[in-house]
């Protein structure tokens, strides 16, 4: 049974049903395995087009859970080459072929994406031979993007560099459809590019890291990780500058604290709408801006 729970939020707009922009959080987790929070991945739908932002662990399972057979997903955007954002790509690609996907899939990513895709496809040559020898199958077409806009049937996706500490070639994305905008920060610490792209956006999807003082003081490796992500004080600065209509904290690295603590701390210095993402949370940006859960 599919469940829908409208939560809140209405925006004034002249959009009609055919102009609806929808985003669904397939996975909102981190590298740590968690059945309630699978690997990071977001499905974006508008104008009969579907695309993915990142393909973390369990993406294909979540697509199956919402009844999506992958046939319309022809464009995937990878924010960076950390394994937790790309490990689900092989599963998506191979399983989509089982479902007889007719079209190839474009993979847009930073430097290194072509080498990654070549290696991935080579790894499964025996499987492909056994299953599809003499027949056509859907392939991956990997494209190394720079900061350019990519138009997918009126959905405009613009990658921009962020600041993920020691990680080179890390990106966020700005997604435009008609008069609606979504900004996805990617993995980043405080970044001017995120701020500049997110000013006045309808939805800012931003990562967060938060720890207790005790945990941080006693973990040298975590202190290094902490510097590569956006802490509570930094996200407050971002939000007070950007003033997005809605902020969704995503891919949350929480150590010794919980979501309620993070929201309390943010609300001390920022009065806008802030929530945490959940797996299978879906949002319609149209005449009404509705947030609901979808899934079996």
Region locations from a protein language model:
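Sec-dependent N-terminal signal peptides
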Residues: 4-13
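Short regulatory "switch" loops immediately downstream of catalytic or recognition motifs
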Residues: 6, 121-128, 209-215
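Binuclear metal-dependent hydrolase catalytic cores
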Residues: 17-183, 194, 261-295
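Cap/insert and terminal regions of metallo-dependent hydrolase folds
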Residues: 172, 181, 189-281
């Amino acid at each position: 049974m599919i469940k829908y729970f409208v939560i809140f939020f209405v925006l004034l707009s002249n959009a009609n049903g055919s102009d609806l922009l929808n985003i669904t959080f397939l996975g909102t987790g981190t590298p740590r395995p968690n059945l309630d929070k699978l690997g990071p991945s977001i499905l974006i739908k508008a104008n009969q087009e579907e695309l993915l932002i990142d393909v973390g662990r369990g993406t294909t399972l979540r697509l199956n859970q919402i009844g999506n057979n992958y046939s319309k997903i022809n464009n995937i955007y990878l924010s960076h080459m950390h394994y937790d954002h790309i490990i689900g790509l092989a599963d998506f690609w191979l399983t989509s072929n089982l479902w007889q996907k007719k079209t190839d899939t474009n993979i847009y990513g930073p430097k290194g994406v072509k080498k990654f895709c070549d290696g991935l496809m080579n790894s499964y040559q025996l499987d492909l031979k056994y299953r599809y020898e003499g027949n056509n199958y859907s392939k991956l077409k990997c494209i190394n993007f720079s900061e350019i806009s990519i138009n997918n049937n009126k959905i405009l996706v613009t990658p921009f560099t962020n600041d993920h500490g020691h990680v080179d070639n890390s990106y966020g994305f700005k997604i435009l459809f008609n008069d609606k905008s979504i900004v996805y920060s990617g993995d980043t610490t405080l970044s001017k590019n995120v701020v500049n792209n997110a000013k006045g956006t309808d939805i800012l999807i931003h990562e967060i890291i938060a720890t207790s003082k005790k945990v941080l003081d006693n973990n040298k490796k975590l202190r290094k990780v902490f510097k590569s992500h956006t802490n509570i004080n930094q996200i407050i600065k971002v939000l007070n500058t950007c003033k997005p209509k809605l902020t969704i904290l995503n891919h949350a690295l929480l150590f010794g604290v919980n979501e309620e603590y993070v929201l309390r701390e943010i609300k001390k210095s920022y009065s806008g709408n802030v929530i945490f993402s959940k797996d299978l949370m879906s949002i319609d940006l149209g005449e009404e801006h509705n947030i609901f859960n979808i899934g079996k």
